[in-house]
Regions:
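Catalytic alpha-helical scaffold of carbohydrate-active enzymes acting on polysaccharides/glycoconjugates
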Residues: 1-39, 44-83, 107-130, 136-175
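A structural motif
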Residues: 77-95
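Binuclear metal-dependent hydrolase catalytic cores centered on His/Asp/Glu-rich metal-binding motifs
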Residues: 89-110, 114
Length: 175
C-alpha cells in the first residue's frame, strides 16, 4: 500500500489521523484486491514516529520508508516483527522526469549504468527499485521506458526481478 492520499504525509499527522488514513487505505486495497496489503510505503517516504507501531498493529509485514541499507532487515522495535525493505530513488520517474526535467530515456539509461557499474562497487547485493507513478509514467512514453528497463534487467545473470513482498520474506520470520 502507498497510503490513501499522496498529499497527506504521516510525519505531519497526529496518531489518530494517521491511523484513520491507514485503515482507509487498507479497506480501499481490500476492496480492489480482495486482501489486505502486506507492506507500506509512505507518500514521499515520510513516516511519523508512530508509523512502525501502527503498521505492526494492522498486520503489515514490511515497510519501505528506509534508505539506510542495501538489503532487507528486521526493524528493531518493541511492537513486533516488521521487515524494512530499503527503498532506492535512482530509477524513479518522479524525480527524474518531474523534478529534474529529464527526458523519459533517462530512466533506462540510469538503470543500465547502475547495472553495468554495479560490480565495481564491490557490494555483494543491493536493492534497486524501478519506480513508476501512474500520473507520471502512466502514459505510452513511460510504458516504453519501463519495458526497456525491465528488458535490460532481464538480460543480466546477476539480477533478480522481484517484489518488496518477496524481499521481506527473506528476513521476516512469520511471513
Amino acid at each position: 500500500a502507498h497510503a490513501w492520499a499522496q498529499n497527506i504525509l504521516p510525519v505531519y499527522q497526529d496518531r489518530a489521523d494517521e491511523e484513520a488514513d491507514l485503515i482507509r487505505g487498507i479497506e480501499g486495497f481490500k476492496a480492489v484486491h480482495g486482501k489486505a496489503p502486506s507492506g507500506f510505503i509512505s507518500p514521499r517516504g515520510t513516516p511519523s514516529p508512530d508509523t512502525v507501531e501502527l503498521l505492526v498493529k494492522h498486520g503489515f509485514k514490511w515497510h519501505s520508508d528506509h534508505f539506510d541499507r542495501d538489503v532487507p532487515y528486521l526493524i528493531d522495535n518493541p511492537f513486533g516483527d516488521l521487515a524494512a525493505v530499503p527503498f532506492t530513488m535512482e530509477v524513479n520517474d518522479m524525480p527524474l522526469y518531474i523534478r529534474y526535467g529529464n527526458e523519459p530515456e533517462a530512466f533506462t539509461r540510469i538503470l543500465e549504468r547502475l547495472l553495468d557499474g554495479f560490480a565495481d562497487t564491490h557490494t555483494p547485493k543491493a536493492i534497486v527499485d524501478l519506480t513508476v507513478h501512474a500520473h507520471v509514467f502512466g502514459r505510452p512514453f513511460g510504458a516504453i521506458e519501463l519495458r526497456k528497463s525491465i528488458e535490460a534487467a532481464q538480460k543480466r545473470d546477476n539480477v533478480w526481478i522481484t517484489t518488496h513482498e518477496e524481499l521481506a520474506k527473506i528476513v521476516h520470520p512469520d511471513f
